[in-house]
C-alpha cells in the first residue's frame, strides 16, 4: 500500500485492490474493511454496497440507483449544454463567474462557472459535454474542480465528461508537428474507410482514449456508424462509409479500441472510454440527401426496402464486439422520422419517440442493455418556421414536453441529449405514476439510473476521478500519438488521377512533383452561404495555405505565368437545400442538393416525394423537379479551368477535400493529377504531392457519372450509382485508387 498527496488530492494505491483518490476539501473520509480502503462517499461512516469496489459494477449501480430520489435520477438522465473551458465572451457557449464574464472575473481558466455549479447542485446533472479547451492542462484542472464539487454532494456521484469527435485534422497547417499539439490529428470518419485497414481505426481509438482520459473525458459521442448510402447527406464525411462489411469492421475496431483497458479481465479500466454509437437505426437515408437537424430534412426513406442492412453496423458489430467489453456502452437514435418503417403501429415519428424502433427492435429483438440517449434537443416545442434550427420533436408536436419525455422513457430511452432542466422529466414521472402506477414508474426510472451509473463505474470514476495535470500535458498530443495520426492521414489520401502526359522523365505520372519548383496556388472564393445553424454567411475569400508553402517543397509565386506547376485546392460542392425565397414566390421551398459546381437543374428528380407532411406546411409533396441550384463554391471550378488556360503545357494538380461524392466530369480532363482527401492536414496532402508518401488509399465512396446518376440511385441502397469513368479510362468506383506507379490492384472483400 502507498499513500500520497498532491495538489490537495489524497491517493491510496492498494496491492490486490483498487486505487482510491479523494479531495481534501470534499469532506470524504476513508473506511477500512478486511484490510482494504474504501471511500465513504455517502458520508455514513459505514461501507455501503455501491462504495465497495469488490462488488460488480452492476451490483453497485443497482444499489445506488435504489437510494436516489426521483429528482436525482432525473438529473442523471440529463446532459449539460456544451461547455467551453474557459467560456469566452462572444463565443457560442457562454458562462459567468459570480455574475461576471470570464474576462471580467479574474478567475482561473479552470474555474467552475455559475451555470456549472447550478446544474451540478440544483439539477443533479452528472453528464457534461465538453467542447473547446484552452489546453490539456487546463482541461485536467477543470475536470478535477468538477469532480471535487461532485464529491461534496450527496452520494458523491462523479462527473462523466463526454465529447464529440475532437481529433479531426482538417484545420491543421501545412507542416507536420511531431509533438506539443493540442491533440493528435486524424482523418474524418470516412477517411478511416479510405484506408481499407481497420487496424488504423483501432490505433486511433487506443490513442484517442488515452488522450480523452487525460482530458477527463470518459464518454465519446461516437463513432458515427450510419451507412451513408445517400451521397448528398451533409454528414457523409463523418460516417464510416456506405459498404456494410467495411463499416462493421471499422465499428468493431473503433469501439474495442476506445473501451478496452489492456490487462483488465472485463476490459474496463483506467484507459476505457465509453462509446455512444450513432445514429440508430441509421441516419444515412434522408430523402434527396436532406438532413434531419432541420425539419425540412426530417424524413429518412427506404425506396428499395433496404432498412435491415442499415441496422447491421449496430446489430452485427457494435453490439457484438470482439474485445472483452462485448458491446458499445450507449446508442444515440437520430432525429429522423424513419418513414414507413413502423408497420406495427403505422406511426411516422422521430426515432426516439418510436415504440417500434426503440422498444420492439433495439430493446426487444436486439436485446440492447446499454444506455439509449436521444440526439440533442428533441423534447422542446418546435420552431414556428420549418427552416429554424430548433427542437426536433417530429410527429409529437401536439404533446407537452413532459408527455414527450414519458413517451421516450417508456420506449426505453434513458437520457435526453441537450436537456439540462429536470422539471419535464420529474413531471413525466408523475404522469407515468397516474398512468402505470408508482411502483412501475419507480422501477423504470431506477433502471435508467442503473444503466447510467454502470458506465461511470466501468471507468473507475467512483474510486479515482482525479487527474495529474502535468501528466495530462505529456499525454495529449504527444509525439507518438501525433505520429500515428499523421501516418493515418497520409494512408487515407486517395490518388484518383496521375496522367503521364506532362510527367517528368523517368516517372509514370506527373506525381510526385520534384522539389524546388515554383508553385502557383490560387485563393478560393466562396459565395454567400448558410451556416450549420442556418445563419447567413457573407461571401469570403480564403487562402488554402495561409502559412505559405513550406520552403522544402518549393517557392510559391503570385501568377501562373511565373509558375512551373499549379496546385489548386478545392472542396466538394456545397449548397443550400431549402429556400424561403422559393417558398415566398409560391414554391414549396425545396431545392436540389447539387454535387456539381455549375448550376444544376433537376430534370430527373421524383415528381412526388416519397415522404412529406409537417404541421407547418399545407402540402406533402417535397419534390424539387425542374428547380435549379448552384454550389456556394462554384468558383473552385473556375480556379481549375483558369489555371489550365493560363498554365498552357505546364501541369495542373487538383487537391480536393471530399465531404461528399462529387461530379468529376466538369474538371477531370483539365487536371494532370487529382488527389482526394477526407479531412486531413495540408501537410499530409503536400507529402503525397511531393513524394513523401506513395499513396495507398482507395475510394470509400462512389463518384457519380453525373447528377442524373445521383437522382437515379436509391437513398437506402449502397454502391448502386453509375460511376464516373475518367479521360484515361479509370472507373471512380468504390475501392479504386492509384499510387505513383499506376492503378492499385482491384479491391476484393
Identify the function of each model-found stretch.
Residues 1-749:
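Glycoside hydrolase catalytic-domain context in secreted enzymes
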Amino acid at each position: 500500500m502507498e499513500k500520497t498527496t498532491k495538489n490537495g488530492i489524497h491517493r491510496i494505491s492498494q496491492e490486490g485492490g483498487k486505487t482510491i483518490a479523494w479531495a481534501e476539501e470534499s469532506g470524504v473520509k476513508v473506511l477500512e474493511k478486511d484490510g482494504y480502503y474504501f471511500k465513504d462517499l455517502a458520508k455514513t461512516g459505514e461501507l455501503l454496497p455501491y462504495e465497495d469496489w469488490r462488488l460488480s459494477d452492476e451490483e453497485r449501480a443497482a444499489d445506488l440507483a435504489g437510494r436516489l430520489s426521483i429528482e436525482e435520477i432525473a438529473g442523471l438522465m440529463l446532459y449539460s449544454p456544451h461547455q467551453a473551458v474557459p467560456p469566452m465572451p462572444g463565443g457560442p457557449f457562454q458562462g459567468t463567474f459570480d455574475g461576471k464574464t470570464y474576462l471580467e472575473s479574474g478567475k482561473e481558466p479552470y474555474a467552475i462557472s455559475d451555470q456549472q455549479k447550478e446544474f451540478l447542485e440544483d439539477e443533479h446533472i452528472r453528464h457534461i459535454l465538453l467542447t473547446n479547451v484552452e489546453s490539456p492542462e487546463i482541461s485536467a484542472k477543470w475536470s478535477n474542480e468538477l469532480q471535487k464539487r461532485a464529491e461534496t454532494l450527496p452520494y458523491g456521484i462523479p462527473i462523466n465528461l463526454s465529447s464529440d469527435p475532437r481529433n479531426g485534422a482538417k484545420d491543421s497547417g501545412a507542416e507536420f508537428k511531431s509533438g506539443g499539439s493540442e491533440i493528435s490529428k486524424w482523418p474524418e470518419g470516412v477517411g478511416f474507410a479510405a484506408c481499407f485497414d481497420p487496424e488504423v481505426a483501432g490505433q486511433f481509438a487506443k490513442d484517442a482514449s488515452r488522450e480523452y482520459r487525460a482530458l477527463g473525458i470518459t464518454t465519446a459521442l461516437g463513432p458515427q456508424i450510419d451507412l451513408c448510402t445517400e451521397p448528398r447527406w451533409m454528414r457523409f464525411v463523418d460516417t464510416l462509409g456506405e459498404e456494410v462489411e467495411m463499416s462493421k469492421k471499422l465499428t468493431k475496431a473503433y469501439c474495442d479500441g476506445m473501451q478496452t483497458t489492456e490487462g483488465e479481465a472485463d476490459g474496463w479500466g483506467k484507459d476505457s472510454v465509453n462509446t455512444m454509437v450513432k445514429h440508430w437505426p441509421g441516419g444515412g437515408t434522408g430523402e434527396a440527401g436532406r438532413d434531419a437537424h432541420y425539419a425540412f430534412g426530417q424524413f429518412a426513406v427506404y425506396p428499395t426496402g433496404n432498412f435491415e442492412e442499415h441496422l447491421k453496423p449496430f446489430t452485427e458489430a457494435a453490439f457484438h464486439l470482439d474485445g472483452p467489453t462485448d458491446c458499445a456502452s450507449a446508442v444515440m437514435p437520430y432525429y429522423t422520422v424513419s418513414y414507413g418503417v413502423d408497420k406495427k403501429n403505422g406511426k411516422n415519428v422521430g426515432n426516439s419517440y418510436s415504440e417500434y424502433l426503440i422498444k420492439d427492435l433495439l430493446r426487444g429483438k436486439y436485446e440492447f442493455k446499454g444506455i439509449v440517449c436521444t440526439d440533442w434537443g428533441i423534447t422542446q416545442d418546435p420552431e414556428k418556421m420549418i427552416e429554424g434550427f430548433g427542437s426536433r420533436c417530429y410527429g409529437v408536436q401536439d404533446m407537452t414536453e413532459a408527455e414527450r419525455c414519458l413517451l421516450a422513457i417508456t420506449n426505453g430511452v434513458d437520457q435526453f441529449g441537450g436537456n439540462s432542466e429536470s422539471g419535464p422529466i420529474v413531471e413525466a414521472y408523475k404522469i407515468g405514476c397516474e398512468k402505470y402506477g408508482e411502483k412501475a414508474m419507480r422501477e423504470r426510472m431506477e433502471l435508467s439510473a442503473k444503466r447510467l451509473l454502470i458506465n461511470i463505474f466501468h471507468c473507475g470514476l467512483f474510486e479515482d476521478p482525479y487527474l495529474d495535470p502535468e501528466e495530462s500535458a505529456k499525454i495529449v498530443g504527444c509525439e507518438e500519438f501525433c505520429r500515428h495520426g499523421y501516418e493515418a492521414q497520409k494512408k487515407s489520401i486517395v490518388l484518383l488521377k496521375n496522367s503521364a502526359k506532362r510527367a517528368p522523365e523517368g516517372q509514370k505520372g506527373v506525381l510526385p512533383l520534384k522539389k524546388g519548383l515554383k508553385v502557383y496556388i490560387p485563393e478560393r472564393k466562396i459565395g454567400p452561404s448558410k451556416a450549420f445553424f442556418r445563419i447567413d454567411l457573407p461571401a469570403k475569400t480564403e487562402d488554402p495555405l495561409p502559412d505559405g508553402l513550406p520552403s522544402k517543397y518549393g517557392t510559391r509565386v503570385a501568377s501562373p505565368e511565373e509558375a512551373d506547376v499549379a496546385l489548386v485546392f478545392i472542396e466538394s460542392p456545397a449548397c443550400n437545400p431549402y429556400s424561403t425565397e422559393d417558398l415566398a414566390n409560391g414554391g414549396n421551398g425545396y431545392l436540389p442538393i447539387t454535387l456539381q459546381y455549375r448550376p444544376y437543374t433537376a430534370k430527373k428528380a421524383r415528381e412526388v416525394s416519397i415522404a412529406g407532411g409537417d404541421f407547418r406546411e399545407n402540402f406533402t409533396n417535397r419534390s424539387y423537379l425542374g428547380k435549379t441550384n448552384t454550389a456556394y463554391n462554384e468558383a473552385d471550378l473556375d480556379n481549375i479551368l483558369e489555371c489550365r488556360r493560363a498554365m498552357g503545357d505546364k501541369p495542373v494538380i487538383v487537391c480536393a477535400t471530399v465531404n461528399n461524392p462529387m461530379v468529376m466530369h466538369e474538371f477531370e480532363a483539365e487536371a494532370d493529377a487529382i488527389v482526394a482527401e477526407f479531412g486531413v492536414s495540408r501537410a499530409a496532402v503536400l507529402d503525397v504531392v511531393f513524394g513523401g508518401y506513395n499513396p495507398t488509399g482507395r475510394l470509400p465512396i462512389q463518384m457519380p457519372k453525373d447528377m442524373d446518376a445521383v437522382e437515379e440511385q436509391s437513398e437506402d441502397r449502397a454502391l448502386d450509382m453509375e460511376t464516373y469513368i475518367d479521360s484515361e479510362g479509370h472507373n471512380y468506383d468504390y475501392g479504386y485508387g492509384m499510387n505513383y506507379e499506376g492503378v492499385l490492384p482491384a479491391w476484393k472483400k
